[in-house]
Amino acid sequence: LGTDGVTRHVDAVLAKANSLEEEGVSSFIMSGGYPVPSPTLTGSIRSDIAFIEKVRGGKIAIADHRVAPVSAETLLAVATEARIGGMLRGFIGMLIMHIGAAAEGLSCVFAALERAPHLGRHLIATHINRSPFAFSEAAKLVAKGGFMDISSGLNVQTLGPDTLKPSEAIALAMRQGVAKERILMSSDGNGSAARYGDDGSVSGLGASDLGSLHTEFADCVKEGMPLSEALC
């Protein structure tokens, strides 16, 4: 889930994943959403992962005006929920972190990893091509064992002039020595995309485009990336 954990529910996400499976599309979900405590199906991210086959991790939002500031202690608690849930199921439980535009960046993440470096491999920072700063923060996370997730639907037209084009962000990460296994790309497909005016007020709402994933994959190849690397 995203901003709306009130009128939208994790059970609806699970139902959609099950319907996609019936149509032949492999699907998994992450429990939780922007708010803390996390909206869940069974009362915790840990038990959601342990008891529900399709749940592979959790979600949280940091550095975003739509959530209260997240402390290192809160991040440690939520990441540990995902970790232990995965241990009970026999895989690595992941925590996807929505990264907003606030100036603190991933400071709470780095503070948490100072105390619990073993959690690094459970963390995915998403929307990191929203700005050069977010990208650099994600690169630091990768150095601590985490993953960077580039949003294929974010570009100058959809977010603003500081946005890194997804295919270019992937190429930049690889030039900087980020292992391709640590670089992800997702569409955020059909997720709400608010447009803001200069005064910070919401001027409109859109939805992230599923087709952007294919577009940026094709651009990676057109811009010189070997097909085998783009597919990874």
Question: Where are the model-predicted features located?
Answer:
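Residue-level detector of anion-binding/catalytic polar loops
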Residues: 26, 147, 226
